[in-house]
Amino acid sequence: MHIYILGSAAGGGCPQWNCNCPNCHGVRTGTINAKVRTQSSIAISENGVDWILLNASPDIRQQLFDFKAAQPARKLRDTGITNVILMDSQLDHTTGLLTLREGCPMNVWCTEMVYQDLTTGFPVFNMLKHWNGGLQYHQVDPKQAFIIDGFENLEFLPLIIQSAAPPYSPHRHDPHEGDNIALIIKDHKTQKQLFYAPGLGKIDDQIMQIMQDSDCVMIDGTLWTDDEMQQTGVGKKTGREMGHLYISGEGGSLSYLNQLSTPKKVLIHINNTNPILNEDSAQFAELKANGVEVAFDGMQIEL
């Protein structure tokens, strides 16, 4: 399984266009040791030619320009991407579908709850309906594994997770199964497994066992502390209120990751306020000392 990190940041990226928090200002001016990061999305492949997008970020055009393998150039108009799997209906995971309209018809895999959001609150399926065949909806049963044509060695097993529907969703405060999923991706050729959960509000015993059984875990690294948005002055909500589990301290994701013998542990979907983006920070050093990696744009993993 080939895994390519297209974007590693949370909504807004880093630097965010209108933000002057220490990280955004530091990246913009080159005064801190941190990388430019776009909004989170990854691509996976079993052969290195045909790819599946996991989420479609608003930054997808630049991400695909930087990702040369996505353009095999076999004909005048071409792409290695024919399928998109959506983990949720958040704007920073779905607005990239508009940019992909030139590639329609495009297969989009998502749960019924996500499809409802994307035909009502943000009706991207409706908007692109008449664009060269539009977005082709494939329903994901959040409790059943599925395989995508052309990727027969890859099996996708959804996992219902605790998080939150986006603010525009009619059921933002009325959660349903399928609002958010994680994915267990098994490569039956290499017998390797990836656990991908860029939006994760809680880690329970089931998730711990899944992570322990995986060869790589790539999970939500949005915030270092639960009150980070408040402490930096850029927001009023806690991480838990937004559906994101913080990293540090008791009950944080690092305390769970440290219990695993999983070979590769990666944090993704990192907010621009998070001190781990600064590679000279104590927080980055703490992760490194514990064998946890911070995802970056262009990062590649082979399983």
Swiss-Prot record:
One of its GO terms (biological process) is pyrroloquinoline quinone biosynthetic process. InterPro entries: Metallo-B-lactamas, PQQ_synth_PqqB, RibonucZ/Hydroxyglut_hydro. It comes from the Bacteria. It holds the Pfam family Lactamase_B_2. Pathway: Cofactor biosynthesis; pyrroloquinoline quinone biosynthesis. Keywords: PQQ biosynthesis, Transport. CDD domains: PQQB-like_MBL-fold. PANTHER family: COENZYME PQQ SYNTHESIS PROTEIN B, HYDROLASE C777.06C-RELATED-RELATED. Belongs to the PqqB family. May be involved in the transport of PQQ or its precursor to the periplasm. This is Coenzyme PQQ synthesis protein B. It comes from Acinetobacter baumannii (strain SDF). The lineage of its organism: Bacteria, Pseudomonadati, Pseudomonadota, Gammaproteobacteria, Moraxellales.
